[in-house]
Amino acid sequence: MPLPDFHSSDPFTLGIELELQVVNPPGYDLSQDSSALIAAVKNDIKAGEVKHDITESMLEIATGVCQNIDQAAAQFSAMQQAILRAAGDQHIQIAGGGTHPFQKWQRQEVCDDERYNHNLELFGYLILQATVFGQHVHVGCRNGDDAIYLLHGLSRFVPHFIALSASSPYMQGSDTKFASSRLNIFSGFPDNGKMPWVSNWQGFEGLFRRLSYTSMIDTIKDVHWDIRPSPHFGTVEVRVMDTPLTLAHAINIAGLIQATAHWLLTERPYKHQEQDYLLYKFNRFQACRYGLDGLLTDVNTGEQKTIAEDMKWLLDRVAPSAEKLGGASAIAEIALMLKQGKSEAQRMRDFIADGGSLISLVQKHCELWATHP
């Protein structure tokens, strides 16, 4: 299918997608009941969307086009209430987090969807292993060239977004030693990681045309880069975050991304070049492995600092943009999190260290999602 023209969007409009865990108490393993839950709530959703993801244990919620994080929060809050009512009727529960700590991928069932079944045939067990849960944030752009500039600009802060959202230290019943183990699941896919280098939209059109020669890429949905342009929406989509444990934290992360996008496209602080990506995988690994304590290495100077230190610098830079966009509260909440020094991944490990079980950890996450907006 040919790549569509880039749809011009109002700059800095916002859309958020969250992949949630559908959980079956009292054992708190993943359920296979998302289809029944979606059927029960779809007529109650007035703004945004509730839909399938890859397997029957995954529930995706997505806002519509929002001007600011307050609009997104209101839409998610309404969805949350509808989902909790239906889940209660069906005796299932909902949790955030980038991975379920002890589910087995062999037990997962792919949704009855033509695209997902095609991917199961193509990728085999990799699709079932991709029963992991992420947050995606779309930011509107005026044109394709702006989208490519923004994509490269946001790529500089991929470690920050990973570390800020990291909530997947446990997988398959084990402590992975990673703050975010979720992203490792995608390493077997041919389109994992950063987008190949292009400098403008014309270059991207050529890139997509060549990718389509493989017969594995038909639409932009078939590429799973860390950040990708979405021409049909007129957005740039950031895809590296674990799903946070609360809607509030997800909203704050989206607010940071929106403010960073505004700063990047308004100030144009960087002249992007291909060598900017030479240490991309190393810095990304540091974020996945160590979270906010990970070390960033500057590709030009070799200077190193922790992600937490550099995050404080970023918050200062984007604060005026956040103020203009109505997202100052997100910056303040993230600054408070940095001051407290505890990520969601660390709080999970603390819970287990204090004698909690993985089952009780999932139970706690379900309670957290149900009681926090």
UniProtKB/Swiss-Prot annotation:
**What InterPro entries does the record point to?**
GCL_type2/YbdK_subfam (IPR050141), GCS2 (IPR006336), Gln_synth/guanido_kin_cat_dom (IPR014746), YbdK (IPR011793)
What is the enzyme's main class? Answer: ligase
UniProt keyword list = ATP-binding, Ligase, Nucleotide-binding
Q: Which Pfam families match?
A: GCS2 (PF04107)
Q: Gene3D superfamilies from the entry?
A: 3.30.590.20
PANTHER family listed in its UniProt record: GLUTAMATE--CYSTEINE LIGASE 2-RELATED
* Protein name stated in the entry: Putative glutamate--cysteine ligase 2
> Origin organism of this chain?
Enterobacter sp. (strain 638)
